[in-house]
Amino acid sequence: MMKKIDVKIVDPRVGQQFPLPTYATPGSAGLDLRACLDQAIELKAGETTLIPTGLAIHIADTGLAAVILPRSGLGHKHGVVLGNLVGLIDSDYQGQLMVSVWNRGQQTFTVEPGERIAQMVFVPVVQAEFNLVEDFVSSERGEGGFGHSGRS
């Protein structure tokens, strides 16, 4: 299913010097977000910084949200992940997309202008209305918590 989302370019290099986000393959769930930087920045081990993407989006559909996720290669090969682990973009947000990048690795990592630093996935949203009850209808699991369902 394809859904149109309003995108505003807030840095004129996006679409010129830096490509617009696209799906890499027909089966891709995520769009890559790029570092919209004037010059490379060095992220020392343990440091976190906020990186602009040069884009603002307005989803405008309360049935959708976007999540910003780490790119698997950056995390696995370099220890570079998101500072907030997952970013949530609400449907009514209209500001620039910023990516909190955290170097949890042991080596300094250089983020180059235009480098793909995160990915954005659009997800359906269900807003819940709470129904207060005294007790729940019994289930097989009940109150079993962490690890209760086993490993095999």
Curated annotation (Swiss-Prot):
Pfam families the UniProt entry points to: dUTPase
Gene Ontology biological process terms from the UniProt entry: dUMP biosynthetic process; dUTP catabolic process
Binding sites annotated in the UniProt record for substrate: 71-73, 84, 88-90, 98
Coiled-coil ranges from the UniProt annotation: none
Essential cofactor(s): Mg(2+)
Swiss-Prot/TrEMBL catalytic activity: dUTP + H2O = dUMP + diphosphate + H(+)
Top-rank lineage group of the source organism: Bacteria
EC identifiers of the protein: 3.6.1.23
Annotated pathway: Pyrimidine metabolism; dUMP biosynthesis; dUMP from dCTP (dUTP route): step 2/2
Top-level class of the enzyme under EC nomenclature: hydrolase
Keyword list, A-Z: Hydrolase, Magnesium, Metal-binding, Nucleotide metabolism
Alphabetized GO MF terms: dUTP diphosphatase activity; magnesium ion binding
Keyword Magnesium: yes
Signal peptide extent: none
Protein family: Belongs to the dUTPase family.
Protein role: This enzyme is involved in nucleotide metabolism: it produces dUMP, the immediate precursor of thymidine nucleotides and it decreases the intracellular concentration of dUTP so that uracil cannot be incorporated into DNA.
NCBIfam families, per database record: dut, PRK00601.1
Name this protein carries in UniProt: Deoxyuridine 5'-triphosphate nucleotidohydrolase
